[in-house]
Regions:
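N-terminal flexible/basic segments that precede or flank functional cores
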Residues: 1-43
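Alpha-solenoid HEAT/Armadillo repeat architecture
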Residues: 30, 70-73
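Short alpha-helical DNA-recognition segment
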Residues: 47-67
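Residue at a beta-strand N-cap/secondary-structure junction
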Residues: 48, 74-77
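Long, contiguous binding/interaction regions
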Residues: 59, 96-97
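DNA major-groove recognition helix of helix-turn-helix/homeodomain DNA-binding modules
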Residues: 77-94
């Protein structure tokens, strides 16, 4: 197995822990790069069972979820909220410090 595949497998395994996933998503948000956050969200979604399982939880269709999590994804707030809720998280606002 290549180093990058081994790293990805370890990352996905660690993101099965909700605290690890929370820290990972927050770190991605702090980078102020929406594309990076979508990559992080894709990884957490994969760790939590993938798009098929999330489609059932979010009541969104698979195609919409795949599109939302793609490299060109631009999720609507309502869809993002539904996805985060299905993953066990919520949207929050904090003061910029």
């Amino acid at each position: 197995m290549s180093k990058s595949k081994a790293y990805h497998a370890e990352l996905i395994e660690s993101l099965r822990d909700s605290h690890e996933a929370e820290e990972y998503l927050n770190a991605a948000l702090e980078e102020d790069n929406p594309d990076l956050f979508l990559v992080a969200l894709r990884n957490v979604a994969e760790a939590q069972g993938g798009v098929a399982q999330l489609a059932d939880k979010t009541k969104l269709n698979r195609e919409s979820l795949y599109k939302m999590l793609s490299e060109r994804g631009n999720p609507e707030l309502k869809s993002l909220d539904a996805l985060l809720h299905a993953l066990g998280f919520r949207l929050a606002v904090a003061a910029n410090r």
